[in-house]
Every structure is written in structure tokens, then in C-alpha cells.
Amino acid sequence: MGYKGKWNERFKNPYVNEKLLKKIRKMNETGERKIIKTWDRACTITEEMVGHTIAVYNGMKFIPVYIQPEMVGHKLGEFSLTRTFRGHPDKSAKAVKKK
């Protein structure tokens, strides 16, 4: 089977980590708001998560992500970047290396 792309995602059920959802439901009942750490970048953001701060691991450290209503339906990993762009090298430095 080939790549189905974004079209197929509309028909698939969203993946939500049960442990994470259980913690959020418990915090919603008590009215508590504390940072929840998770390594699960593939977890889909649901309406229950709105208003919570979830620290998502990016491979080096946990990045706190405050969940807003516009984020519902996206993945947690989309808001925790894994790569840092340090810029392109200067042309003068490149010319010196060639000599």
C-alpha cells in the first residue's frame, strides 16, 4: 500500500495516551493546574487538555506547551521543536577554507 497522506487522517481515530488523559481528567476534577511531563509527541491534543501546560520532551529537554483551543486536533510534537537552526555559514569563512 502506498502513502495516503493527510486525506486518510480524517478517517482514523486520533491517538491519545491513556495515562496522560487520565492525569488531565483528574486535574480537571480537582481544578488543579500543574505541568505534566510527557515523552509522547505523537499524542493528539483533545478538548479536555485546553488550559493545561504539558512539558513535551524534544530529545534533549522538556519544552512547556500551554494548550490553547486552536491546537485541538494537532499533535504535541508539533509544538516542541527538535532542531535548532544556527544559520548558514558566512561566505567569507567558506572562501578562506578553499585556499
UniProtKB/Swiss-Prot annotation:
Family matches, as InterPro entries: Ribosomal_uS19, Ribosomal_uS19_bac-type, Ribosomal_uS19_CS, Ribosomal_uS19_SF
Lineage: superkingdom: Bacteria
Pfam families: Ribosomal_S19
Keywords, sorted A to Z: Ribonucleoprotein, Ribosomal protein, RNA-binding, rRNA-binding
Transmembrane segments: none
GO BP, sorted A to Z: ribosomal small subunit assembly; translation
A single Gene Ontology CC term: cytoplasm
GO molecular function: rRNA binding; structural constituent of ribosome
Cystine residue pairs: none
PANTHER family: RIBOSOMAL PROTEIN S19P FAMILY MEMBER, SMALL RIBOSOMAL SUBUNIT PROTEIN US19M
Family: Belongs to the universal ribosomal protein uS19 family.
Protein function: Protein S19 forms a complex with S13 that binds strongly to the 16S ribosomal RNA.
HAMAP family membership: Ribosomal_uS19
Protein name: Small ribosomal subunit protein uS19
High-level lineage: Bacteria, Pseudomonadati, Aquificota, Aquificia, Aquificales
